[in-house]
Amino acid sequence: MTLNKQQLTLNCDMGESFGSWKMGADDSVMPHVDMANIACGFHASDPNVMHDTITLANLHDVDIGAHPGYPDLQGFGRRSLSMSSDEITNMVIYQVGALQALCRAQYTDIGYIKPHGALYNDMMKSDAVFRAVVKAAALFKVPLMILASQENEKYLEIADDYDVPLLFEAFADRLYQDDGMLTPRRHPNAVLKDELAILEQVRTLADSGRVKTASGSYILLEADTICVHGDNEESIALIQKIRQSLYSGGN
């Protein structure tokens, strides 16, 4: 089988358990994705979970990405913290360095960085935060995954100052605004629930590089990868359908 013309990959946040607390269904999801965004201990995860998730990714030949977030276990990294640019850079280096060390222990490496939660959102809203994260990615010489939007060129120009490649991601199950940004989760319908709507969004992205917005308009969205979520049996089945759709071109 061959991927469609844009060769979109699937990425998923993983390794977000902590001690005896379990989150997600990584064992079931990993065989169906191309890239695993592994939590690095600040918003979720711990050294043992990180190790086990790396092992699982290696088993299924899945690219490993570092998924750093704000130091906020209780809030799952979804609350913004006021930090200086240097603090953000060092915070990201600290987390990515931990995951990279655990990767090296298994003779592998991280392939990219994708910030989590509020850090991801802040990075897309603030050029200063974006630069702080890019500086960390430059140290590890890996691409940075960010939200595909109408401002891709702006972010490419900033990242180019540090020789950091960018990976642009779209979301299978999120409602978009006309400016290409995600509808905030506090709004109703921000997360798509209907399976057919999610599959249609993925197919439209893959076939034409467009996405339907909350206003009913279509906008261009240049993406390299699609983020999926695998929290339960229903979502795992949906990931399988999304992957099949990408490989079959929707047939």
Swiss-Prot record:
Coiled coil: none
GO molecular function, one term: 5-oxoprolinase (ATP-hydrolyzing) activity
Catalytic activity, as annotated: 5-oxo-L-proline + ATP + 2 H2O = L-glutamate + ADP + phosphate + H(+)
Cross-referenced Gene3D superfamilies: Glycoside hydrolase/deacetylase (3.20.20.370)
InterPro entries in UniProt: Glyco_hydro/deAcase_b/a-brl (IPR011330), LamB/YcsF/PxpA-like (IPR005501)
One Pfam family named in its UniProt record: LamB_YcsF
E.C. numbers: 3.5.2.9
GO biological processes: carbohydrate metabolic process
Leader sequence segment: none
Keywords carried by this UniProt record: ATP-binding, Hydrolase, Nucleotide-binding
Top-rank lineage group of the source organism: Bacteria
Function description: Catalyzes the cleavage of 5-oxoproline to form L-glutamate coupled to the hydrolysis of ATP to ADP and inorganic phosphate.
Entry-linked NCBIfam families: PRK05406.1-3, PRK05406.1-5
Family: Belongs to the LamB/PxpA family.
Subunit structure: Forms a complex composed of PxpA, PxpB and PxpC.
Protein name: 5-oxoprolinase subunit A
Organism annotation: Vibrio parahaemolyticus serotype O3:K6 (strain RIMD 2210633)
Lineage summary: Bacteria, Pseudomonadati, Pseudomonadota, Gammaproteobacteria, Vibrionales
Gene expressing this chain: pxpA
